[in-house]
Amino acid sequence: MLEFLRKLIPWVLAGMLFGLGWHLGSDSMDAKWKQEVHNEYVKRVEAAKSTQRAIDAVSAKYQEDLAALEGSTDRIISDLRSDNKRLRVRVKTTGTSDGQCGFEPDGRAELDDRDAKRILAVTQKGDAWIRALQDTIRELQRK
């Protein structure tokens, strides 16, 4: 029995050393891969934060543009008035005249100031919205 234990002890020690090495190796590889996964996660989070900051800047610029539009429409209308230009729309004639009224040969009518202001505001808001949307798309595609 003593002879058997003498032959068995080196094998048991070799098995324990192998198991210890395996365990330490797997722990170090796990730590290495966990670190790589963590680094990749940090890179993605930083990229997402950077993209969000860029989108926030686009949004802030869009909000500033919208705030500036109110004075802009008034300025455009006053510039048109100072140049003696008018905003006009085409109108369809409704029928023949009985000869008692004036005749407008080009079939156009002048817009009311409030309507002109509203139309200009809508078009300028639409332009600002499209520019902001295009800037947002550019920032998201830069990713």
UniProtKB/Swiss-Prot annotation:
Record's GO cellular component terms: host cell plasma membrane; membrane
Record has Membrane as a keyword: yes
Compartments it resides in: Host cell inner membrane
Transmembrane segment boundaries: 8-24
Endoplasmic reticulum as UniProt keyword: no
Superkingdom: Viruses
Topological relation to the membrane, as annotated: Single-pass type II membrane protein
Entry keyword set: Cytolysis, Host cell inner membrane, Host cell lysis by virus, Host cell membrane, Host membrane, Hydrolase, Membrane, Protease, Signal-anchor, Transmembrane, Transmembrane helix, Viral release from host cell
Periplasmic side: 25-143
Main location: host cell
GO biological process: proteolysis; viral release from host cell by cytolysis
Cytoplasmic side: 1-7
GO molecular function per UniProt: peptidase activity
Record's subunit section: Interacts (via C-terminus) with the spanin outer lipoprotein subunit (o-spanin) (via C-terminus). Part of the spanin complex which spans the entire periplasmic space. The spanin complex is composed of spanin inner membrane subunit and spanin outer membrane subunit.
Function: Component of the spanin complex that disrupts the host outer membrane and participates in cell lysis during virus exit. The spanin complex conducts the final step in host lysis by disrupting the outer membrane after holin and endolysin action have permeabilized the inner membrane and degraded the host peptidoglycans. Host outer membrane disruption is possibly due to local fusion between the inner and outer membrane performed by the spanin complex.
UniProt similarity note: Belongs to the T7likevirus i-spanin family.
Protein name in UniProt: Spanin, inner membrane subunit
Lineage of origin: Viruses, Duplodnaviria, Heunggongvirae, Uroviricota, Caudoviricetes
